């Protein structure tokens, strides 16, 4: 599957990162790892590698890499929180199922971690000179992502319906 466009492009380094991190993600989940930071890391590293390719300038590239890392962390956690009840029902791996917290405490902890990650994304975004789509990126990071976190606090049936 990863052989799609990135493999056919001029980005062999990103391809190697993706392959290694996808293998690492599978291994962590198969082992039943409970460390949320470790579990977020492969997705974070993949998005960091992807965003770092958007600039040739070293300083900007480093900021984009950090933004990508944080975005990947957000994606992994938000997806896990979104799938928590379904994964519990089907016996699938979910990092939040590894916690012994009650569901409401778990949601509060996840919310705090997600909002902290979003705050760091905003700080990284502030370091970039946005040439294109600045207002759109600002809206997504500062409004859209926090709204999604709040929506994930609701039971699945009360969440806004999204097309899959």
Which residues does each predicted region cover?
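Short, small-residue-biased leader/transition segments that mark boundaries at the very start
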Residues: 2-6
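A short, charged helix-loop
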Residues: 23-28
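Catalytic cores of Mg2+-dependent Asp-rich isoprenoid enzymes
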Residues: 10, 15-18, 22, 33-48, ...
């Amino acid at each position: 599957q990863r052989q799609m466009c990135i493999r056919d492009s001029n980005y062999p380094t990103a391809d190697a990162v993706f392959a290694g991190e996808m293998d690492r993600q599978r291994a962590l989940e198969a082992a039943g790892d409970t460390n949320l930071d470790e579990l977020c890391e492969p997705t974070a590293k993949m998005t960091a590698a992807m965003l770092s390719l958007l600039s040739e300038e070293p300083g900007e590239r480093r900021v984009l890499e950090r933004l990508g890392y944080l975005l990947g962390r957000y994606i992994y956690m938000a997806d896990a929180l979104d799938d928590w009840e379904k994964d519990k029902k089907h016996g699938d791996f979910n990092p939040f199922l590894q916690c012994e917290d009650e569901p409401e405490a778990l949601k509060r902890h996840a919310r705090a971690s997600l909002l902290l990650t979003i705050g760091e994304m905003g700080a990284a975004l502030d370091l970039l000179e946005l040439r294109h789509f600045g207002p759109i990126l600002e809206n997504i990071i500062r409004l859209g992502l926090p709204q999604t976190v709040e929506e994930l606090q609701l039971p699945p049936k009360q969440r806004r319906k999204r097309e899959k």
